[in-house]
Curated annotation (Swiss-Prot):
Protein name per the record: Adenosine 5'-phosphosulfate reductase
Keywords from the named record: Cytoplasm, Iron, Iron-sulfur, Metal-binding, Oxidoreductase
Organism this protein belongs to: Oceanobacillus iheyensis (strain DSM 14371 / CIP 107618 / JCM 11309 / KCTC 3954 / HTE831)
Gene encoding the protein: cysH
Protein's cellular compartments: Cytoplasm
Main function: Catalyzes the formation of sulfite from adenosine 5'-phosphosulfate (APS) using thioredoxin as an electron donor.
Pathway: Sulfur metabolism; hydrogen sulfide biosynthesis; sulfite from sulfate
Main location group: cytoplasm
Residues that coordinate or bind [4Fe-4S] cluster: 125-126, 208, 211
UniProt record, GO biological process: cysteine biosynthetic process; hydrogen sulfide biosynthetic process; sulfate assimilation, phosphoadenylyl sulfate reduction by phosphoadenylyl-sulfate reductase (thioredoxin)
Cofactor binding remark: Binds 1 [4Fe-4S] cluster per subunit.
GO MF annotations in UniProt: 4 iron, 4 sulfur cluster binding; adenylyl-sulfate reductase (thioredoxin) activity; metal ion binding; phosphoadenylyl-sulfate reductase (thioredoxin) activity
Leader peptide range in chain numbering: none
CDD domains: PAPS_reductase
Amino acid sequence: MGGYSVTYSNFVKDPYKDWFPDDETNGASKILQWAYEVYGTDIVYACSFGAEGMVLIDLISKTQKNADIVFLDTDLHFQETYDLIEDIKVKYPTLNIHIKKPDLTLEEQAAEHGSALWKRQPDQCCYIRKIKPLEDALSGAPAWISGLRREQSVSRSKTDFINKDERFKSIKVCPLIHWTWDDVWEYIKDNNLPYNELHDNGYPSIGCIPCTSQVSDSSDSRAGRWAGTQKTECGLHTSD
């Protein structure tokens, strides 16, 4: 796999669109090697520290030991998520893990937009606390890495390894597109990786506390997010 440059301005299509990997990581390791060859340390991994995140952090650590990883701290995450981040810092001390917060504190957001904005206008809340901070974090970065998998949802089913990201005017690299939910957990268990203990208590997908619900059937890896609403994405992976 050649390390030739793919940028937002010259992107035509995923150069590996017709590649069907048959290695033990379903192509993830080779895509990460390509990404770090092309973009070096300028590429950023935006990690939510979910199950897919544990897989990617481990794979990235084997490819680029001083990689930059950004966590969008909305100030609304579960304590278990914050605890996991500290565990990851200990396990992978050479990785550069950055905590990115919104411009507004929760108190300032309430004063400006009203209390519990996530209930009344969840899209606006996601923009303030997740999308805008990631825009800032990716400013000047030619590419970023995401843990999207095709199996996760209809809206993610067409994701390629290398994508033109209209939202952030960047290249989005998605090494796990061919992974299933079972693949993710098999890798975690086989490699004895740390993970968020909420996964063992009915939380397949873990985000902010107000927008994450416990579910009885955890076979759907996106179940429990924005329950009772039509919302299925925070907006990081949509173009508008």
